[in-house]
UniProtKB/Swiss-Prot annotation:
It comes from the Bacteria. It comes from Escherichia coli (strain K12). Homotetramer. Aceneuramate binds at residues 47-48, 167, 189, 191-192, 208. One of its GO terms (biological process) is N-acetylneuraminate catabolic process. HAMAP family: N_acetylneuram_lyase. This is N-acetylneuraminate lyase.
Length: 297
């Protein structure tokens, strides 16, 4: 059902203007930039997209704009997860209407929901998605929901679930999931272990830094398919040098600043309460943008 969703999917950033409103022009440029750099698809409205500091209406606007701009050129996954099941269902219905290829939802968080309540939440969203496959989003570090392997196995076998975004450093668990579910579309979620995730059984990945250097991750996929471990390791190391800097600057604002220097994003600001990048990092981020533009050619 979801086999065509395999690949390298950028977790799309959401640009804002100086007044903190959606910057629709920059969003369109960012979609085109990702298409041009050879990304297989976009994961829209997730953690990287700052979904949880946006209104429901804004999240729907983002989905609509991305769908218009992508025009069937790449695969589109709409993250529709909210704490509220009803709001998640509304976004899922919108994703279906706009022509997305799949929906995704993080486990509902903040309140200590039971596992059966998690399952019911996903069933309701799947129903509203009207045939679109569900990508279960497991990110325990941010959601606070620590699913056991048995619980993951249950979620990914719910009717309508076609994939799992596994944002965890537990590569043993990644391998266990792959072993148990050989046909499941399985995404690596942490960019810094992309190559290791593929070796542990992931089909591809969904990541934030793909927005600025997606071709490197495609290079890792190609190298591993050819059995060239040395090249894959080298590319992962180069990616991780960038990630080291972004962790210091704040990942989302750092990425937006790099894209600003690449003339893709007009204003390199995140939605408050996120603050701006510390000015001391601007020279490094500008140099990184120049390096990546030269590398991409």
């Amino acid at each position: 059902m979801a086999t065509n969703l395999r690949g390298v999917m950028a977790a799309l950033l959401t640009p804002f203007d100086q007044q903190q409103a959606l910057d629709k022009a920059s969003l369109r440029r960012l979609v085109q930039f990702n298409i041009q750099q050879g990304i297989d698809g976009l994961y829209v409205g997730g953690s990287t997209g700052e979904a949880f500091v946006q209104s429901l209406s804004e999240r729907e606007q983002v989905l609509e704009i991305v769908a218009e701009e992508a025009k069937g050129k790449i695969k589109l996954i709409a993250h529709v997860g909210c704490v509220s099941t009803a709001e998640s269902q509304q976004l899922a219905a919108s994703a279906k209407r706009y022509g997305f290829d799949a929906v995704s939802a993080v486990t509902p968080f903040y309140y200590p929901f039971s596992f059966e309540e998690h399952c019911d939440h996903y069933r309701a969203i799947i129903d509203s998605a009207d045939g679109l496959p569900m990508v279960v989003y497991n990110i325990p570090a941010l959601s606070g929901v620590k699913l056991t392997l048995d619980q993951i196995n249950t979620l990914v076998t719910l009717p309508g679930v076609g994939a799992l975004k596994q944002t965890s450093g537990d590569l043993y668990q990644m391998e266990q999931i792959r072993r148990e579910h050989p046909d499941l579309v399985l995404y690596n979620g942490y960019d810094e272990i992309f190559a290791s995730g593929l070796l542990a059984g992931a089909d591809g990945g969904i990541g934030s830094t793909y927005n600025i250097m997606g071709w490197r991750y495609q290079g890792i996929v190609k190298a591993l398919k050819e059995g060239d471990i040395q090249t894959a390791q080298k590319l992962q190391t180069e990616c991780n040098k960038v990630i080291d800097l972004l962790i210091k600057t704040g990942v989302f604002r750092g990425l937006k600043t790099v894209l600003h220097y690449m003339d893709v994003v007009s204003v390199p600001l995140c939605r408050k309460p996120f603050g701006p990048v510390d000015e001391k990092y601007l020279p490094e981020l500008k140099a990184l943008a120049q390096q990546l533009m030269q590398e991409r050619g």
